[in-house]
Amino acid sequence: MLVQCDATMLAAVALAQGKEQSRYYLKGVCFDREYAVATDGHLMTVAKAGVSYGSVDKGAEIPEPVVMPVSTKAITAMKKSAASHVLFDGETLKVFDDGGAVLYIEQCESIDCTFPNWRGVIPTVEEDAECAAAFSNVLLAKLAATATILSGGATIGVTLKGSDALSPHK
């Protein structure tokens, strides 16, 4: 099975993957249908990352979620402006540019595990609904790093809205 996704989105999501050996199943990015998901058990990043799957059998159904470790070196390669997409074949991770040239390659096997039920953690919110969030300095640093990757270094802003006791206040 082949998994292909957007390099920038994967780099941003991978910042949230775990590092603890005791929770080895969090030490990678989970590809679940069109989503890339990573968590360290405290912070979770979910993104529609342009995930597509290749198979010898073109009629094959979308596979079960697969968890792939993403190294710091791979994340660095994905953050380069020339990086376009990433291809993972179960044994190797390759970062490509728009022309199809390989920018980075590393051996990496998928993690044989069951990834946590991330859909049960992410609240469903109607588009116009206000929602609340609380942020620690560690989380804000990771959010800033994620936003920097996604914006290409451009200045960004975050707006927090809320009107109840649990909402962020000005």
Place the predicted regions along the sequence by residue.
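DNA polymerase processivity clamps
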Residues: 1-170
